[in-house]
A protein has these predicted regions:
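Short, low-complexity N-terminal intrinsically disordered segments enriched in polar/charged residues
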Residues: 1-30, 34-38, 42
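A beta-strand edge to alpha-helix "cap/lid" segment located at domain peripheries
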Residues: 2-9, 76-160
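Charge-dense, low-complexity intrinsically disordered segments
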Residues: 11, 15, 58-61, 119
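Intrinsically disordered, low-complexity regions enriched in Ser/Pro/Gly/Gln/His and often acidic
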Residues: 30-31, 71, 131
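A solvent-exposed, acidic/Ser-Thr-rich amphipathic alpha-helical stretch
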Residues: 37-109
């Protein structure tokens, strides 16, 4: 039995890329929850295309720092946040098999926001579509579309 090492190397590279993409998506979510805005920024390209139109924010290209500031301002009013992003489906744009420079990752969205003065929690459920690009520092989110299936609670945190 012979082993095609180039094919094996390609398959290993694909697994490494998939793992790095999923890790980037998870770091995006956990950085939000921890308020680690430098880590959050490191998951994004500059500029980054954001489409949160289903939540009321029209799709637009943002300078990375502008989007980080926007996210920080909107999320830090909540005392606690939990963003869960499971069920990752990664597909690659195979211009160069085994060394793709772009990929797509779809993941579920479960975002819970808590404030002690709110009447309950604010929950969002749906999914994300991430367009990922390979950069000198690894994979990063170049475009993000948020799809909302349903929400519960009041999206406006008390401003006490």
């Amino acid at each position: 039995m012979t082993t095609d090492l180039s094919s094996l190397a390609t398959r290993i590279q694909r697994l490494e890329d998939r793992t790095a993409i999923v890790d980037t998506v998870i770091r995006y979510a956990t950085a939000i929850d921890r308020g680690d805005w430098n880590a959050f920024a490191s998951t994004l390209t500059d500029p980054v295309h954001i489409d949160f139109s289903e939540a009321g924010l029209p799709a637009a290209d943002f300078a990375r720092d502008d989007f980080v500031g926007f996210a920080r301002q909107g999320l830090e009013v909540w005392t606690a946040r939990q963003h869960i992003s499971p069920n990752h489906v990664v597909t690659f744009d195979d211009a160069a098999p085994g060394r793709s420079s772009t990929a797509h990752c779809q993941s579920y969205l479960y975002a819970q926001h808590y404030h002690p003065d709110a009447a309950g929690v604010f929950l969002m459920r749906g999914w994300y579509d991430h367009t990922m690009v390979r950069t000198a520092d690894g994979w990063a989110i170049a475009a993000l579309t948020q799809h909302i299936s349903w929400v519960e609670g009041d999206r406006n945190a008390p401003t006490t």
